[in-house]
C-alpha cells in the first residue's frame, strides 16, 4: 500500500514540475485508491490507499474515501464519473460516454436542451476478464492492441453461456466488480468449452465486453447520436472495432472532446475533490440509487 501511495506522490511531483506549479498552488488531490472490495448491498466499499501518507509526501491536502458516503445513503457508490461526464461532455445532441477500465460503465447524457435526467451504470466486465485470460495463457499483462484476440474467432456457444449471467439483464443503475466477474466466474463459464483454442476464448471475451456494452446502450440510450470512449480499453483495437461495428459512424474517443482517454477518470476524481472542498454534492442519485445528493469524501490535511 505504501508503494502505491509513494507512486501517487511521485506522479504528483512530476506533474507539478511539468506545469511549473508548486504544492501551494494546488487546493487538494483527489485520491481514489484501488478498490479491493465493493459490496454496497452489505453497506461497504473498500479502497486500498494511504491518503495521510500522500498528504505528507506531497505537502498537499488530500480528499479520499469518495465512495462510502454514497453507500451510506443507500447508494451503489458507483459509478461516480457520470456527474463529471455531464459537467464536461454534455452537448447539443444526446451522447453516451463509455469508460472501459476493468469494469465498463456508461453515462447517458441528454442533449443540453433536453431533460437534465442522467442515467449511468456498469455494463459488466471491461478489460478485466480479457486481461485475466491473457495473463493466464500468455503471461503478458494484457493483450497489446487486441492482437492475440484478433487471431481467434468468436464461439457463439461460449458467448451465449457468458451472456446468460443474470447481471446483464438488470436495468441501470447498477454496479459490479471483481466480486462477481472473478477468475472463478470465468472458470465456471468455461466448463464444457475446454476444447476451444485459447485465442478463440480471448476473442469471445472481447465480444462479451462489446456485446454487453452495446446491448446496454441500445436498451437505455436508443436515441444517442454520439458515443465517446475513454479508459484503457480504447487501446484494444479489436474491442474498439467490435463496439464500432454496432454503432457505425457514431464512435470516437474523448480526445475528440478535448480530453485524452486516459485522463478522463483522473480528471473526474479531481473534480469530485473540488466539489468536496466547495461543500457541493458529487453523486447523482439517479445513477447510484442513493437517497439523495451527498458531499463525497474525507479530508486529510497536509
Predicted feature residues:
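Phosphate-binding/catalytic loop of phosphoryl-transfer enzymes
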Residues: 40-45, 52-56, 60-141, 295
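Conserved ATP-utilizing enzyme core subdomain
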Residues: 115-210, 214, 278, 288, ...
